[in-house]
């Protein structure tokens, strides 16, 4: 894709001078204007008018596509992104992808046809290669999940390290049989967290029973039912590592309703009621506000200067918040 820097090189001027020509700066000489116009024609370059309007302070719109706005993690992230962009005079078009991969392409392409100035997206499918032609003309940043089949800019959290810390924490409190509950491996966050779980199980010499790994469906309620079945079986798990917030909420409710108050649990992702429950829920905090803020920064860099080098991969640290549920000792046999 031809950029402003390419035009500057062919015209023999700086990128700043090219920008001044685009913005009709009266202090640029006619000779310089002609050289820039000649270079544009030679390279078949069309100025990014959306970026121009953004710099001029005009209203522009950014698309934000997430799996589920009801998920507390994505809800907090969405609020952060909206506040940040609207404070800069930019509207935000929010859409939900759901958890079915077939819906993702339809929703994103419908959004991109609206000629938005940029897109922030947390994908749900296993292949984003269909976005390649769109990315040529619309800046994109991938959030929470790295794109697959496409080279793109993405901002994620340390899923691997967070899962390792969660399981290690349970191991330090005496647990040997730790169950993993998550969603489909189609989601890259689940894949990385499962790898972190397995790494910690091996490192701490825990029981590597395959029956302790459960990914029944996208439904947290089904995960809760499967957990209760495992707790009723011989040699049940004494602790649970939950892969995401909806799953954690369903598992905690099921444990309470079934009277399994001695089962330890650590969830990946914080949520509003986590500290108010009894016992309060130990979590791996993902910092959704920080993720959203950096995603906005990366997107604005790409909008302002499409040819600029932007850091492609950003991984934010996570932190364990001990509150009680992850510190319960194993129940006596």
Say what each PLM segment does:
Residues 45-110, 114-117, 195-198, 202, ...:
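Amphipathic helical "hinge" segments at domain boundaries
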